[in-house]
């Protein structure tokens, strides 16, 4: 039986490196472990010098049986290391084929994209004169969301700088903690909302107040989660159906307020407020119960917590009863940096960081974060000036193209969407970091580095994924009911985005593709290849499965955001033709190569760790 070294007392001095080495040596060899009492009885009083003497005795083979066992262990280690090296060499050898293929693939995609954009630009909607100077290079601003964000960027940047400076001054000179900062953010965010929504702020405050009363009255009841969901889904649907309501429905003497509805539709932003209201309700409900997280066990496993910093998981599990006030609640719902587009942060995590500002990012880190955003923005500008992917999708001109060009446009649209959301979400997260509140990072991984649906959704709207896991997936039964939960979760995600049939179709298509992946992944996790050939075949099958998954993911997203359900049959018929089948095969081969490259990236990360 192995001794528990964590309970061994090495005198009153701090353990030296030599002492640690002795313990590791004893742990590695059972013959030493069986003689542990004799070794520990050495008259050393726990000093490093005496431990050095014991280690010398051990390494000089004065303990019987040590040399034989050491030789056997060394042989086993050498054999394992040799196999690992051979495996790494064979996998690295793949790069000789994979990297040139990827380079040729992207050169071809870029050249063909330039060609079709140049040939059809006169038929496309949403192109505007750009800043490259040549009339040949127009800017694709056909996406309304990107166009609005881009045009409002100067005024947003002024507001960002002003709010960040005021927050810093207020906290520094008034030494404000959670209560003071909540008052500050409530006041300044309310002014921000008056500019955005005008008189419609009345609707926001009314619904938020009703939700607060519901939480405070029923949070101790077992049926509270059901009430919370019914209330919030009811208003989510009503806001969309009635398009934010008209003041005239309350009487003609209120109709004049419809002339003061602000510059931004309030019911669009309110989708994020719905998520925050549910978060507040659940966090308060759980605060009245016992803690659900073993903090000591978490700290032992979490690398962020081990480094002396506080991770997001700990922040969102901090239940401080004094934080659940109406002022803190409203400041959380209306917090200006994250109000328009997120990222989504839980109530507990927000309240904790008003008390003590985030320490994960230093001033230098935040500055570098902002600089990287500027580089990414310039990349987006270059992309929209050269490639008109979204304009093809909006104009419907893609239906006139060949199957190869349809694939290129579809692939380009997904990359455009990824970069668009990447820039929007990181801009507002940068603003929040400047103000001392860290929200989860959306888009932590590139779109082209996700070879399965689970990885894709964890790394797309990542903060929303964390929210769904915490407030839907786990309460609905977690992994035990995973095959059923996915339908409820993705249907909610579709309805939350908008009341459109094509989004419902996207959600259900995603579920249909998700379920086989979950079944296969569950079987793959329990499979252990015993031979080199077995590992090779398993890796090849995984790469092929990744290629199919990426293809399904493209189809689901094109249905949801571009062609709609009615375009599925047309798309399938296009690729079943004599011209389309070679494109389909080439697409699968390209995605297979891409998946193998993703495996190489993951292997490199594991080696670094």
Short names for language-model regions:
Residues 2-31, 35-609:
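Non-catalytic, membrane-anchoring transmembrane segments at the edges
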């Amino acid at each position: 039986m192995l001794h528990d070294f964590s309970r061994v007392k090495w005198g009153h001095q701090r353990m030296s490196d030599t002492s640690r080495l002795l313990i590791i040596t004893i742990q590695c060899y059972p013959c030493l472990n069986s003689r542990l009492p004799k070794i520990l009885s050495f008259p050393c009083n726990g000093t490093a010098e005496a431990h050095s003497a014991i280690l010398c005795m051990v390494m000089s083979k004065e303990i019987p049986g040590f040399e034989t066992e050491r030789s056997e262990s060394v042989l086993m280690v050498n054999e394992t290391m040799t196999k690992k090296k051979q495996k790494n060499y064979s996998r690295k050898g793949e790069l000789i084929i994979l990297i040139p293929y990827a380079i040729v693939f992207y050169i071809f995609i870029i050249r063909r994209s330039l060609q079709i954009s140049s040939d059809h630009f006169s038929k496309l909607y949403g192109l505007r004169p750009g800043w490259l100077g040549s009339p040949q290079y127009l800017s694709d601003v056909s996406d309304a969301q990107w166009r609005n964000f881009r045009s409002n960027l100067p005024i947003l940047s002024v507001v960002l700088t002003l709010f960040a400076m005021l927050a810093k001054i207020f906290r520094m000179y008034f030494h404000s903690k959670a209560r003071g900062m909540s008052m500050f953010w409530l006041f300044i965010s309310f002014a921000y909302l008056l500019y955005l929504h005008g008189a419609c702020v009345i609707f926001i405050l009314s619904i938020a107040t009703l939700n607060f009363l519901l939480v405070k009255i029923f949070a101790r009841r077992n049926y509270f989660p059901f009430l919370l969901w019914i209330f919030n889904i009811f208003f989510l649907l009503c806001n969309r159906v009635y398009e934010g309501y008209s003041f005239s429905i309350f009487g003609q003497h209120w109709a004049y307020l419809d002339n003061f509805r602000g510059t931004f539709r309030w019911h669009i932003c309110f989708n994020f407020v719905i998520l925050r209201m549910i978060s507040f309700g659940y966090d308060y409900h759980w605060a009245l119960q016992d803690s659900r997280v073993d903090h000591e066990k978490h700290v032992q496993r979490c690398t962020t917590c081990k480094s002396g910093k506080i991770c997001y998981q700990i922040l969102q599990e901090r239940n401080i009863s004094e934080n659940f006030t109406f002022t803190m609640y409203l400041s959380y719902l209306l917090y200006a940096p994250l109000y328009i587009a997120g990222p989504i942060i839980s109530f507990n995590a927000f309240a904790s960081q008003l008390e003590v500002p985030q320490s994960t990012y230093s001033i230098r880190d935040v500055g570098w974060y902002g600089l990287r955003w500027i580089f990414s923005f310039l990349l987006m500008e270059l992309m929209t000036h050269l490639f008109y992917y979204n304009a093809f999708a909006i104009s419907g001109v893609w239906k006139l193209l060949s199957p190869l060009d349809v694939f290129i446009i579809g692939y380009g649209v997904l990359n455009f969407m990824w970069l668009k959301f990447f820039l929007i979400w990181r801009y507002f997260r940068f603003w929040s970091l400047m103000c001392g509140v860290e929200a989860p990072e959306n888009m932590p991984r590139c779109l082209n580095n996700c070879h399965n649906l689970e990885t894709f959704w964890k790394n797309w709207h990542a903060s929303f994924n964390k929210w769904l896991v915490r407030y839907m997936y786990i309460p609905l039964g977690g992994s035990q009911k995973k095959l059923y939960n996915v339908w409820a979760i993705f249907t909610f995600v579709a309805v939350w985005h908008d009341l459109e049939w094509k989004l419902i179709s996207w959600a259900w298509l995603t579920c249909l593709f998700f379920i086989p992946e979950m079944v296969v992944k569950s079987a793959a996790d329990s499979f252990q290849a015993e031979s080199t050939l077995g590992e090779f075949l398993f890796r090849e099958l995984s790469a092929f499965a990744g290629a199919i998954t990426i293809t399904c993911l493209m189809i689901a997203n094109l249905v949801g955001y571009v062609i709609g359900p009615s375009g599925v049959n047309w798309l399938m018929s296009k690729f079943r033709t004599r011209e389309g089948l070679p494109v389909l095969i080439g697409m699968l081969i390209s995605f297979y190569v891409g998946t193998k490259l993703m495996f190489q990236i993951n292997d490199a990360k594991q080696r670094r760790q």
